[in-house]
């Protein structure tokens, strides 16, 4: 009985505390080149943080919009201009836009704009990169 109560309390803490706070990712120097990425898991939520050619750093849910497969499995690395889903090869630019979706060209109602990666809020403070899954969280600064 105690274990069940502890598990329930922990699940509530995850929802009420950890899903609503800022999470440290690393220093902006870890994103030296376009295509550099870091994967940060917050319990069951996986986030991929990327550096785009424009120099900006973005955060996305690490989930393909096609079938929900995890996009990036390595903790960190570098890609050549896009994130590619290993399941059906949907490709996303480093700014989250869907660039390629094989075998969708014959679908009249399919729009790449409707299938961009879902953003995760990211802020950089004094060179340190933070993410939050709460769109209403107070600014990190």
Q: Model-derived features: where do they sit?
A:
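Non-catalytic accessory segments flanking enzyme active sites
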Residues: 2-47
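Rieske [2Fe-2S] iron-sulfur-binding domain
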Residues: 31-135
């Amino acid at each position: 009985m105690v274990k069940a109560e502890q598990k329930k309390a922990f699940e509530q803490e995850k929802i009420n505390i950890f899903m609503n706070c800022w999470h440290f990712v690393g220093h902006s120097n870890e994103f030296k080149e376009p295509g550099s990425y870091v994967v940060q898991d917050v319990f069951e939520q996986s986030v991929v943080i990327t550096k785009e050619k424009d120099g900006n750093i973005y955060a996305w849910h690490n989930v393909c919009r096609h079938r929900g497969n995890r996009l990036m499995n390595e903790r960190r690395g570098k890609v050549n201009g896009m994130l590619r889903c290993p399941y059906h090869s949907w490709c996303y630019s480093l700014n989250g836009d869907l660039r390629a979706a094989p075998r969708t060209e014959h679908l009249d109602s399919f729009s790449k704009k409707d299938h961009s990666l879902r953003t995760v809020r990211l802020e950089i403070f004094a060179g340190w990169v933070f993410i939050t899954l709460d769109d209403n969280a107070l600014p990190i600064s």
